[in-house]
């Protein structure tokens, strides 16, 4: 049973790493949008309120938090679906083992995601 959990743990790391890359691409896109919004706001005094809001550090932080939450939500949903499929196959369709494997893997995925978010937030400070 521990071997199954160990193997599934590596599967989750493989699942979440590409998702993290997508999240970083989203963060890069957001940084570009921030730069564009700031240049637009300074070039045009009557720029839209969205561009001016992005120039505000608090609004930028809130927008970044929303983007991170969406990326994390997508990653967790995908991880849950894959965990169920992998655990179901590994447990040989035994309900108790399936539930136990799924709980273990979801906890591991949440710990990994928490670590990634804390690491990202530390870099932002």
Swiss-Prot record:
Organism domain of life: Eukaryota
Keywords, in A-Z order: Cytolysis, Disulfide bond, Ion transport, Membrane, Neurotoxin, Secreted, Signal, Target cell membrane, Target membrane, Toxin, Transmembrane, Transport
Subcellular location: Secreted; Target cell membrane
Keyword Transcription regulation: no
Positions of the propeptide segment: 22-91
Family: Belongs to the formicidae venom precursor-01 superfamily.
Protein name: U11-myrmicitoxin-Ta1a
């Amino acid at each position: 049973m521990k071997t199954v959990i160990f193997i599934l743990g590596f599967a989750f790391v493989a699942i979440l790493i590409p998702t993290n890359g997508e999240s970083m691409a989203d963060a890069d896109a957001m940084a570009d949008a921030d730069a564009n919004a700031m240049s637009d706001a300074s070039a045009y005094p009557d720029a839209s309120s969205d561009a001016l809001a992005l120039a505000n550090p608090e609004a930028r932080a809130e927008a970044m938090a929303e983007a991170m939450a969406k990326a994390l939500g997508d990653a967790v949903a995908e991880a849950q679906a894959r965990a169920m499929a992998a655990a179901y196959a590994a447990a040989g369709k035994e309900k108790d083992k399936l539930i136990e494997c799924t709980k273990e893997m979801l906890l591991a995925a949440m710990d990994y995601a928490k670590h990634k978010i804390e690491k990202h937030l530390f870099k932002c400070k």
